[in-house]
Amino acid sequence: MANMRKSHPLLKIINHSFIDLPTPSSISSWWNFGSLLGICLLIQISTGLFLSMHYTSDTMTAFSSVTHICRDVNYGWLIRYLHANGASMFFICLFLHVGRGLYYGSYAFMETWNVGVILMFTVMATAFMGYVLPWGQMSFWGATVITNLLSAIPYIGPTIVEWIWGGFSVDKATLTRFFAFHFILPFIIAALAMVHLLFLHETGSXNPSGLDSNADKIPFHPYYTIKDILGALIMISVLILLVLFSPDLLGDPDNYTPANPLNTPPHIKPEWYFLFAYAILRSIPNKLGGVVALVLSILILALLPFLHTSKQRSLIFRPITQVLYWILVADLLVLTWIGGQPVEHPFITIGQLASILYFSIILIFMPLSGLIENKIMKWY
């Protein structure tokens, strides 16, 4: 069996990726989130597949088909809430995964990092389209507001919006195509994740020190398989607790009201994982400027390899940049809070200041602190 594992064309690939993969001996639990994201994707695809068997993508029956899933289908409520809260777990793991990459300088592997940025955009697009499907008030108005942003594109904007809608407003055609895209995108995400892994295994993983670890590597199995299983058990336990005790904790009560184009909810807001980007969008009084800032809030990650000025890779020995990093984390939490607040004083000002700080830290302060730390190293 050992020989077959190393000689069989298909098993050989699996062996080199998950069994005999040389892995740095010092990587911490912060490296668990890649495997957790894979598990989240599997949970989402499997629960989504069962939901799609009972869901109908028609404006007249979409809301009642979701109600039917929860009330009449065996364990339909469980599948539905696993899917909804699984998305939240997905984004928690995604943000922690990106945060770890930022802290330990994983963006130095440019190919892996850029595929990761594309993956993040794809996951966000998938989650947005999934939120539209239950056809509640927040689904409808969220879809209307976000798709309308494309009308800010000069000259071709309004045409693109009508093309996406399949008419002159968000309606049956929009819901049907969003369902089609929401179904296919997770498989594209799975393919991109394989490309992400392919590029990662070309270079090997980094480690907390940011130094070369070729002299000190251990096989992935059993050491890191056990570690990943522990991480998976913790994550699944948290997900099950969330689903069984407070399944609507992260949702919006407005989405339990069927979509009504004649009645606008008092506060239109997306799911919690988009609130930071939504706050950045709202903080700019110009429509096109807001859309550009919204896209840049994620696309800025692709610039990180070019903004790296330090002679060290990781932040572990860089106290000034460490302080900036944690200010950035706090700033993102403030933006998330602001995104859920109404557009009124003082929230508008706080949102604008937090948005300026977000871009300033990444584009100005972090590269400057890298240069300052290089100078300090020369003195000692």
UniProtKB/Swiss-Prot annotation:
Its cofactor is heme b. GO terms for cellular component: mitochondrial inner membrane; respiratory chain complex III. The keyword Ligase does not apply. It is a multi-pass membrane protein. Binds 2 heme b groups non-covalently. InterPro entries: Cyt_b/b6_C, Cyt_b/b6_C_sf, Cyt_b/b6_N, Cytb/b6-like_sf, Cytochrome_b, Cytochrome_b_C_euk/bac, Cytochrome_b_N_euk/bac, Di-haem_cyt_TM. GO terms for molecular function: metal ion binding; ubiquinol-cytochrome-c reductase activity. Heme b b562 binds at residues 83, 182. The chain crosses the membrane at residues 33-53, 77-98, 113-133, 178-198, 226-246, 288-308, 320-340, 347-367. It is found in: Mitochondrion inner membrane. Pfam families: Cytochrom_B_C (PF00032), Cytochrome_B (PF00033). A ubiquinone binds at residue 201. Belongs to the cytochrome b family. Heme 1 (or BL or b562) is low-potential and absorbs at about 562 nm, and heme 2 (or BH or b566) is high-potential and absorbs at about 566 nm. The cytochrome bc1 complex contains 11 subunits: 3 respiratory subunits (MT-CYB, CYC1 and UQCRFS1), 2 core proteins (UQCRC1 and UQCRC2) and 6 low-molecular weight proteins (UQCRH/QCR6, UQCRB/QCR7, UQCRQ/QCR8, UQCR10/QCR9, UQCR11/QCR10 and a cleavage product of UQCRFS1). This cytochrome bc1 complex then forms a dimer. This is Cytochrome b. It comes from Mystromys albicaudatus (White-tailed mouse). The lineage of its organism: Eukaryota, Metazoa, Chordata, Craniata, Vertebrata.
